[in-house]
Amino acid sequence: MFDAKSFIEESVEDIKKQINGRKTIIALSGGVDSSVAAVLTGKAIGDQLLAVYVDTGLMRKNESNEIWNIFKEQMGLNLKIVEAKDLFLSELAGIDDPEQKRKIIGRIFIEVFEKVAKEQGEEILVQGTIAPDWIESEGQIKTHHNIALPSGMVLEVVEPLRDLYKDEVRKLATELGLPEKIAHRQPFPGPGLAVRILGEITEEKLEICKEANFIVSEEIEKTGLQKELWQYFAAVLDTKATGVKGDIRDYNWVVALRFVKSLDAMTAHTPEIPFDLIKRISKRITSEIPNVTRVVLDVTDKPPATIEFE
């Protein structure tokens, strides 16, 4: 049985020893993993910690504002937001291979942190890596952005959660007093919406993905189903389909819906979702996002599929 209180006590001491008085940056995404890592590190080293949130442009709708309100205004963390959308999108232009996209995001992600670290005199980078991240990477299922570190990286990495699974991290979040919204937030991939946009990432597909995911989250959370689901999201497929808008033929993008249940992300299954809810989500997406003509439902378990599309 996982003892959250004991883990916190031991981790705080371990982090103190690892960091040993050095100035430290944490990669804060607002997900439960990085949030718990931030609080643990803060308990260990206090004001030596600088929480850095990189706005890659690949995040959820309104994410930067929510991060600021929760972590700066409510929790009082020493928080710096780095606007890097243009940098990420320019580097990703023309790239359609999923592994290339992940590696580019990982490289830029670390480079941005290194730049801030040099400016602030930081030496340590804390990451919220958990067990499924490195297990999948070692098994070559997919590369996770927060462990595909470039050679010659200047910062030393500390990963206080690397042996834990998501359910254990959520228990830690509750024990640490994190807001319910963070403690039980659905997992969000490190590379952001990049793994929910198949093929090349364009501004058009990115905006579709943001709006579609916002609609899915809003509708699921209205019903309370988020408490039963591991993840619920939309992906933009790299294909178009014929539709009709008004009396006019339209040839535009296809959005896929995905709902899964899981305990630790190593396996997952597709539950039955009320069909009227699926229809409502589909209708909202096709009516509120002009350049989407079709919505489909992915019912594939993991394995054989992974949870995210890329």
Curated annotation (Swiss-Prot):
GO terms for cellular component: cytosol. One of its GO terms (molecular function) is ATP binding. The keyword Ribosomal protein does not apply. It catalyses: XMP + L-glutamine + ATP + H2O = GMP + L-glutamate + AMP + diphosphate + 2 H(+). ATP binds at residues 29-35. Catalyzes the synthesis of GMP from XMP. This is GMP synthase [glutamine-hydrolyzing] subunit B.
